[in-house]
Amino acid sequence: MPKNNTNENFQSGAGLIRYFNEEEIKGPALDPKLIIYIGIAMAVIVELAKIFWPV
């Protein structure tokens, strides 16, 4: 008769949990607002460049 083991975990879920616990952020932490502001500033610079230096 097979032994009934009640301590078994869901194997694929355990691997994901272990993966996310070991993940580390190695890059610089940037505020999301800063990314938006940089994008807006770049768009303004490109539009001004098109006005002052038409091709």
Curated annotation (Swiss-Prot):
The lineage of its organism: Archaea, Methanobacteriati, Thermoplasmatota, Thermoplasmata, Thermoplasmatales. This is Preprotein translocase subunit SecG. It is a single-pass membrane protein. The chain crosses the membrane at residues 32-51. The gene is secG. It is found in: Cell membrane. InterPro entries: Preprot_translocase_SecG, SecG/Sec61-beta/Sbh. One of its GO terms (biological process) is protein transport. Belongs to the SEC61-beta family. Pfam families: Sec61_beta.
